[in-house]
Amino acid sequence: DLHNALWVLYKRMSEAQSFTNPMKYLLMRDWPLLKRYEAEMCRRFDAVTAVSEEDKAALIEAGAPSDMTVIPIAVDLDSQPYIERQPKGPHIIHIGTMYWPANINAINWFLDAIYPLIKARLPEVRCTLIGARPPESIIERAKADPSLTVTGYVDDPLPYLQDASMMIVPLKAGGGMRVKILNALAQGIPMVTTTV
């Protein structure tokens, strides 16, 4: 079982970094190594599954056997009941691990490029970022902007989902299946995401 082709994520993350960011060069060094490693791991097993056709193709490109099976991630609708939402005005939420570099990059891009455009049209908009271990840089942004809230980890996101007008997944780099998108759609939460 492979959750996703991780080398693709590292490659996309390297492409999303600016040339002045040292992380770009670490990722540029690491993704080809990871690509070879993932192919080698796939060759060691009699059967391998991937979560999407895209991941299967990426693993085959890396050198994995082509007889891989795709088993898409599914959402149990009984365990993800529809949520009756009653937002108190326009409210955007993001749920995701806030120490994962792809999520940090996504949130910074959203706050720099997209959120100001939304605020210009909807000055009363609120944005709540939910997820464990947010970096200090994002916490500082929230201190400077009263419309932005950073919660850190929450035991139960239900109150935030009930108050959400929409959920965002603004990834600029990623791989595999974004399960949170499936969960939110099953729960009736409007979703805006990038094409990654």
Which residue stretches match the model-derived regions?
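Acceptor-binding helix/loop patch of EC 2.4 sugar-transfer enzymes
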Residues: 1-36, 97
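Conserved catalytic-core segment of nucleotide-activated headgroup transferases in glycan assembly
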Residues: 61, 70-163
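Nucleotide-sugar donor-binding loop of glycosyltransferases
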Residues: 2, 133, 170-172, 188, ...
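Short hydrophobic beta-strand element within catalytic cores of glycosyltransferases
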Residues: 180-183, 190-194
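Donor nucleotide-sugar binding/catalytic pocket of nucleotide-sugar-dependent glycosyltransferases
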Residues: 7, 27-82
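Short Ser/Thr-rich beta->loop micro-motif in glycosyltransferases that lines
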Residues: 51, 152, 169-175, 195-196
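Acidic donor-binding loop of glycosyltransferase active sites
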Residues: 46, 147, 159-176, 187-191
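Generic beta-sheet signal
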Residues: 1-2, 51, 71, 130, ...
